[in-house]
Design a protein with these regions (language model features):
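Active-site neighborhood of phospho(di)ester-bond hydrolases with catalytic His/Asp-centered motifs
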Residues: 22-24, 42-50, 70-73, 131-136, ...
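Pre-active-site segment of Zn-dependent metallo-hydrolases
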Residues: 13-51, 56-60, 74, 110-114, ...
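Binuclear metal-ion centers of metallo-dependent hydrolases, dominated by the metallo-beta-lactamase
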Residues: 68, 80-93, 170, 174-222
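Zn-dependent metallo-beta-lactamase
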Residues: 1-20, 27-30, 96-99, 103, ...
Length: 222
């Protein structure tokens, strides 16, 4: 089984067989997080874009642990310039790692870094396919992501204001056709306050997918 921990916002960790991936490791100044970033251990860090609430503690954690930052070329180059191990990619690209593979997907959002783009990830982690959409608006080509991948778990933002909201996320589920949806990027601050329970009700009424609400700082097995 894979251990998934939700540290709030878009901060996720995946662990299996002593390999841990962190995604968008926003610990410091995250009002819903209870984890001390100085105690976090990991092997890889995926960063979807360079806004403070997504790149978060990536540089400090990578320096301390030796973890490899996997991100777009601009973020990877910046991380390397600060003394981190990094692996640069770009939208549409896929690369194999010890745990499986990472493919970089489109996300409609600002980048937070000069010359960069925001992105999402298709993560093949020990034979589970996990789609981390990143901060994104709804876009038509999300249907291609669903068509080309048998998605076990889709991690979708529902907060609105900065990303798609619950109504758009519902449409994304219809196009992606995942087995399970985990809502993220909500309730960190008042502008993105949402009811994941209402989202769950609408998705399960209109789609075949199940919605799994993971409480902040909770770990589950998937």
């Amino acid at each position: 089984m894979i251990k998934l921990k939700y540290n709030g916002h878009a901060n996720i960790s995946l662990t299996k067989d002593n390999v841990t991936i962190l995604i968008d490791p926003f610990f410091t100044d995250n009002p819903v997080n209870k984890t001390n970033p100085n105690e976090v251990e990991c092997d890889y860090i995926l960063v979807s874009h360079a806004h403070f609430d997504h790149i978060g503690d990536a540089i400090d954690i990578a320096k301390r642990t030796g973890a490899t930052i996997i991100s777009t070329a601009e973020i990877a180059n910046m991380a390397e310039s600060k003394g981190c191990n990094s692996h640069g990619m770009n939208i549409g690209g896929k690369f194999n790692f010890e745990f499986g593979s990472v493919k970089v997907t489109q996300a409609i959002h600002s980048a937070g870094i000069e010359g960069g783009v925001a992105c999402g990830f298709i993560i093949d982690f020990y034979a589970k396919t996990i789609y981390f959409a990143g901060d994104t608006a709804l876009f038509g080509d999300i249907e291609l992501i669903g068509r080309m991948n048998n998605i076990d778990y889709a991690l979708l933002p529902i907060g609105d204001n900065f990303t798609m909201g619950p109504e758009e996320a519902l449409e994304a589920v219809k196009m992606l056709k995942p087995n399970v949806v985990i809502p993220i990027h909500y309730d960190t601050w008042p502008p993105i306050a949402q009811s994941p329970q209402d989202f769950k009700k609408e998705v399960e009424k209109n789609c075949d997918a199940k919605v799994l609400i993971v409480d902040f700082n909770e770990s589950i097995e998937i």
